[in-house]
Regions:
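ATP/NTP phosphate-donor binding region
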Residues: 46-134, 287
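Short, acidic/small-residue loops that bind anionic groups at enzyme active sites
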Residues: 158-189, 195-199, 323-332
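Bacterial N-terminal signal peptides
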Residues: 13-22
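Accessory alpha-helical/coil subdomains and C-terminal extensions
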Residues: 49-51, 60, 66, 73-76, ...
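Internal gly/pro-rich beta-alpha loop/helix module
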Residues: 174-245
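Bacterial signal peptide processing site
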Residues: 25-27
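Short Gly/Thr/Asp-enriched flexible loops that form oxyanion-binding sites at enzyme active sites
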Residues: 147-169, 310-319
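ATP/nucleoside-binding phosphotransfer catalytic cores, i.e., glycine-rich phosphate-binding loops
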Residues: 40, 50-51, 57, 287, ...
């Protein structure tokens, strides 16, 4: 992988001095929850002997890092550039070298899938990534997967994997809000924590997880809530699956179907149906619906106000699109709450961007409206 030399040295020079890999003290609230919290030591995750590469510890879990670019691999002109930088400047080998402490908890190997900003992730990249994850997890020599990813569309990729991965082994998606060259870059510790979670046997069966800022969230519920703050990823009303301090602590689980429980098999899929998102607003017209239909959309997610509300103009345009064979999903632009059923498919509690992911996979499987609604209610 060819790395921009201007950023290579800066990455290690500024990242490593700010690595703080020590656990925080347990709060009184955490102590009160001890009965419901599962404490996991990453080093205890797998005791059986593994076939390993030269130089690896065969008593540590094997974690594969799949790098896709993003801010975590970004580089800026100076160490104070936290917003003016280029994503995807640092390769996976440099990311791993910047956190040598990972070798104490896992045998880590890296693979560069792409090296781009996350707004450039396409359906083709999603399929490539999903198939590669399934291929790796089918091996007895891989215990968990960590995917480094840009934060702008991280939740979409994570939810996609939550629906298509066919393994109970941990899959963790991780990113950063500050580039690798910045003062107090958050990427190295986030990456270390992600490997720690992926190494944990208690992380099995929890679907795809997102790890940032010492928090473990389900891909189903997590969303980006701030443009630049390091604590941008929130699980909102549903809460986090767990936290990371000296060890990995799980205090919650996910009840929605995921990974091995879903109907989606992408092994033979080469192309996903086109699904677009239309944003509801005052004084809207019908031309965006018409444009989407003419452009070949197979489904439309409408991000309505409040409870997925539609204006009369939008409702009429949606009915015309539906008559033309286009599936319509009502979601909400509010970010929280369940969109109650009315006329069209309800996104349930999925935000518009995740509703798009589920509708694409649903349409690749069926055109039955009731079945698609069932997917939204269960997944």
């Amino acid at each position: 992988m060819k790395i921009n030399k201007k950023f290579r040295n800066k990455s290690l020079a500024f990242v490593l001095p700010f690595m703080i890999l020590v656990g925080c003290g347990t709060t009184a609230q955490e102590k009160g929850q001890e009965d419901s919290i599962v404490k996991v030591s990453a080093s205890e995750s797998n005791e059986e002997v593994k076939d390993t590469k030269d130089g690896e510890n065969n008593r540590l879990p094997n974690v594969q890092i799949l790098a896709t670019g993003g801010t975590i691999a970004g580089g800026g002109e100076s160490n104070t550039s936290t917003t003016d930088y280029k994503a995807g400047e640092v390769g996976v080998d440099e990311l791993i070298k910047a956190v040598p402490e990972m070798k104490e908890i896992a045998n880590v190997n890296g693979e560069q899938v792409v090296n781009i900003g996350s707004p450039d992730v396409t359906n083709e990249i999603l399929l490539k990534l999903g198939k590669r994850v399934n291929e790796l997890l089918a091996s007895d020599n891989v215990d968990g997967i960590v995917i480094t990813h840009g934060t702008d569309t991280l939740e979409e990729t994570a939810y996609f994997l939550n629906l298509v991965v066919k393994s109970d082994k941990p899959v963790v998606v991780v990113g950063a809000m500050r580039p690798a060259t910045a003062i107090s870059a958050d990427g190295p510790l986030n990456l270390y924590n992600a490997v720690k979670v992926a190494s944990s046997k208690e992380a099995r069966g929890k679907g795809t997880m997102v790890v940032l800022n010492d928090r473990i969230a389900s891909a189903r519920y997590v969303t980006k809530t701030n443009t630049t703050a390091p604590d941008t990823f929130k699980a909102e009303e549903m809460g986090y699956l767990g936290t990371i301090a000296d060890d990995v602590y799980f205090n919650n689980t996910i009840t929605r179907k995921h990974t091995t429980e879903t109907d989606f098999d992408i092994s033979t899929i080469e192309k996903l149906p086109q699904v677009d998102i239309l944003y509801g607003h005052q004084n809207e017209g019908n031309y965006l619906f018409k444009a989407a239909v003419e452009a070949g959309s197979k489904g439309i997610v409408y991000a309505g106000s409040g409870n997925g509300s539609m204006s009369e103009v939008a409702d009429e345009a949606a009915k015309e699109a539906e008559d033309a064979g286009i599936e319509i999903v009502r979601s909400s632009r509010t970010g929280n709450g369940v969109v109650t059923p009315k006329d069209y498919i309800s996104a349930n509690s999925l935000n518009p961007q995740k509703a798009r992911i589920l509708l694409m996979l649903s349409l690749a499987k069926t055109e039955d409206k009731e079945k698609i609604q069932q997917y939204f209610d269960e997944y």
